[in-house]
Regions:
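Glycan-recognition and catalytic cores of secretory/periplasmic carbohydrate-active enzymes
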Residues: 1-390
Length: 390
């Protein structure tokens, strides 16, 4: 979609924004009544979530949604539930329950970092720093990157994925909080490596990239959840958008500003007519493939984050772009009430199997926890000056 065509779409207005916020916190309240201090599964089934243990990579997003609701409403029921979660996250860290992953930022930034920022709770701070230390353990000196998944001595897992750009703020925060540069240095090393190998010449993104475990040399880009190694997985593209924006906030590296614009513009240029992207950009208008609403939610948050640091003309464009994406989500994907779902955002995709990837079909045309969270974050960003959890 050409920029001039995109600019013809309406932006989310103030009235619709505040109506969406009110509805969103009603949804959060309904879900809290259902789940209490329990966690939700990664994605819904027939639009309703089931209970889950705190052993999944997505657990932090539900806690983060509770913190957003508390910030906006002041209702202590949201705070109390979120604080109960921080106790569970401490136990998870101490017992190392499913912590052999780079997703420690997804887990601990919207839960424990948020708790510390909003309440000053020292236990939450200590837990988040413990998670940052565990994330540092995943850094490979030879390759100069944080390994995504699995055992660190498994050569088959010697790779990074684009999602990790959203985990780096945990390290940036840890350096700012402790005064120890080791966290920041490793985050900066990872982002340099990741952007060098993951962003293609046309500014689309690989999902994952392998390195030689003996030498650390880059080997090849492939996909796990995209259509194919050469396609542009929609959610991967938006992890790039938001991840670059966050690293720019912490480093002010001018190269990231330039790269952000190219990566974000690729996303906009490949949007379909209704502005809800297909789960992979290989698909275009007329395809029967499912959309992934969560990709738009994350992209909107990334654009709003970066706009804080751009010259006015560019900032206005990306704020307007985010408002157009959020309006499309409000109009077409937002849950209308508890009878429809206990989530926030319909029409997400977790995994879609193809002959060219190694994931499975699950969470298709369902709510998912990151889609719910980033949709709510996008609304909050548009409604107030907000201090990010990231």
């Amino acid at each position: 979609m050409k920029r001039e065509e995109f600019l013809k779409y309406p932006e989310l207005g103030e009235k619709q924004l505040y109506e969406a916020l009110e509805r969103a916190w009603g949804q959060t309240r309904f879900a809290l009544e259902r789940f209490g201090t329990d966690f939700k599964h990664i994605f819904s089934t027939n639009q309703f979530y089931t209970k889950a243990e705190n052993n999944q990579w997505t657990n932090g997003f539900w806690t983060g949604e509770l913190w957003l609701a508390y910030e906006c409403t002041g209702d202590p029921c949201f705070r109390d539930a979120a604080m109960a979660h921080t106790v569970s996250f401490r136990e998870r860290a101490e017992r190392r329950i499913e912590t052999d992953t780079h997703d420690l930022g997804f887990l601990y930034s919207p839960s424990c970092v948020a708790a510390y920022k909003l309440t000053g709770d020292k236990n939450a701070r200590e837990t988040a720093l413990l998670a940052a230390d565990m994330l540092l353990e995943r850094f490979h000196e030879k390759g100069q990157f944080l390994q995504a998944w699995g055992s660190l001595d498994d050569p088959g897992n010697y790779r990074l994925i684009i999602d990790c750009l959203l985990n780096l703020p945990l390290l940036y925060w840890a350096s700012a909080e402790t005064g120890d540069d080791k966290y920041r240095e490793k985050a900066q090393a990872h982002v340099r490596t990741a952007l060098k190998v993951l962003i293609r010449p046309d500014y689309s993104a690989y999902h994952t990239f392998y390195f030689d475990p003996e030498t650390g040399a880059p080997l090849r880009g492939v996909t796990h959840q995209g259509y194919s190694a050469d396609s542009a997985w929609a959610r991967g593209q938006e992890w790039g958008i938001y991840g670059i924006a966050l690293s720019y906030r912490y480093t002010r590296d001018p190269a990231y500003e330039v790269l952000f614009e190219y990566v974000a513009d690729y996303f906009i240029e490949h949007l379909p007519e209704n502005l809800i992207p297909y789960w992979d950009f290989v698909f275009t208008d007329g395809s029967s493939e499912p959309r992934d609403s969560s990709a738009s939610a994350v992209a909107a948050c990334g654009m709003l984050e970066m706009a804080r640091f751009l010259p006015k003309e560019k900032a206005d464009f990306y704020v307007g772009a985010a408002k157009r994406l959020m309006k499309a989500l409000c109009d077409q994907c937002a849950v209308r009430g508890p009878e429809e779902s206990d989530g926030q955002l319909l029409h997400g995709v977790y995994g879609r199997k193809t002959p060219y990837n190694d994931c499975i079909d699950h969470g298709i045309d369902e709510c998912n926890l990151w889609g719910d969270y980033y949709y709510a974050e996008g609304l909050v960003r548009l409604s107030r000056e907000w201090n990010p959890y990231w």
